């Protein structure tokens, strides 16, 4: 959106809105980084030949999972039965699933990955049942803009295909309902302001 563009530009960045989908924008940025002296691509999705930086970013996402695990313990929850996490390329989901799979190695929770229906590349890969990546292309129109990614992170896919119990391709109304429920919860629960992508698993 224009507001996001302006906020990023205030930090001194050159910002463009392109008439292409997320995955094509990633390819364009990688090309420009290659052609720029001392250019470095910093991106959380991985592909063959570009794995180191995405793995560092996933480790950062893993810190959030670690903090959540510590809070669960503080509240007396020894092991959650289910863990829901949203996915675009799957980097965050891979980090969360990887962390909790190791934390509860003897009896892992049931992991549920929620994607935007219009960009459900992980769901399609899981449904195919052959362990191979599936790609979704085109505009991938959805209100869950942060999840409108059609090409999985290759590192994450290796984790997710082996540990996730359920993949969900969620229509937009699921995210809209999630936002409403988080913003106006049942009595006693604190309200949470969330965007569409963050609310998708709820």
Which residues fall in each region the model found?
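PLP-dependent amino-acid enzyme catalytic core
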Residues: 1-202
